[in-house]
Amino acid sequence: MENNTKKTVFSGVQPSGVLHLGNYLGALTQWVEMQNKYNCIFCVVDYHAITVKQAPKELSGRILDVVRTYLAAGINPAKSVIFQQSAITAHTELAWILNCAAARMADLNKMTQFKDKAGNKESVSVGLYDYPVLMAADILLYNTDAVPVGEDQVQHVELTRTLAQRFNRDYGQVFKIPKVVIRKQGARIMGLDDPAKKMSKSASSAANYIALTDSPEVAVKKIRRAVTDSGSEIKYDPKKKPAVSNLLVTYSLLAGISINELEAGYRGKGYGELKKDLAEEVKKFLISFQLKYHSFKDDEVRRILKDGADKIGPIAEATLKNVKIKLGIN
């Protein structure tokens, strides 16, 4: 990395489905802000994506689409490293070493996200169970100081800290202990059809989310059909008015207007007016975002991925070499 005095930030997105407004507001805008203060490494975590079955041709295209999304959101490859996880073999090597030298079955049995995703299915892959250890390897390879994640990933970063501390204790100091960074507002943009559930690319209904590739017309319809709460007052109260609160947060983040200002502006007005104005704001955003998104051609995206891997590959290899020396297998 260019500036060794800056702290290092690492995060990533799976190319496993459509990226949506929740990803943009909850993660990508935060990353864009961070790249001016930190050495930022943003990964397309394709090995994580294949923990559930993917159609190969679709996966290949989605990898490029994730990078386009990064770029359209404002992540600048001159400031941040963007790379594909599978391009650097040290990720899977370190994951295996951590499996053997630091991780315990008891650790993984506590992971709530696996329980949520797997349910009682016996056909679930071992990779999905072991996902948090690969995530730990992703983070630890680059001497990461901070990991911006959603609330559903906090437990995995805590496991990363545990594995790093355990390895350092048993074999000698190698890993930096990373900290979790959670955005205060917008960390969880909720579903338009059910404000009790997070906006998610794996939702059973497309009414749950606004995809960043939705046509503006489709997005407007989704906003207008979004569920609301009983009563008519437009007030931010996540417990009593979760649906309206979610719309207010979305509006606030997109338009750069405080929630207090929005509440004052909609005093005496109805939900219909709020949704109409929010729909217009979303429409303007999507038109601008998609213009940038479609401007990045495949060859340019592949070059950015290669340049990123070339830049940080040596860091990963140096960490892995140090780990192997400590283990006596180098």
What is each stretch, according to the model?
Residues 2-137, 286, 291:
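N-terminal Rossmann-like or analogous alpha/beta NTP/dinucleotide-binding catalytic cores
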Residues 13-15, 46-48, 145-146, 203, ...:
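Short, histidine-centered active-site or binding-site loop motifs used for metal coordination
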Residues 23, 155, 161-330:
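Conserved nucleotide- and phosphate/pyrophosphate-binding catalytic cores
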Residues 55-56, 146-150, 234:
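Short, polar/flexible loop-turn hinges at active-site or ligand-entry regions and domain interfaces
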Residues 81-84, 148, 231:
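Short catalytic-loop micro-motif centered on adjacent basic/acidic residues
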Residues 102-109, 141-148, 252-262:
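Short helix-capping/linker segments at secondary-structure and domain boundaries
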Residues 113-167, 171, 191:
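Internal, conserved structured core segments that host functional sites
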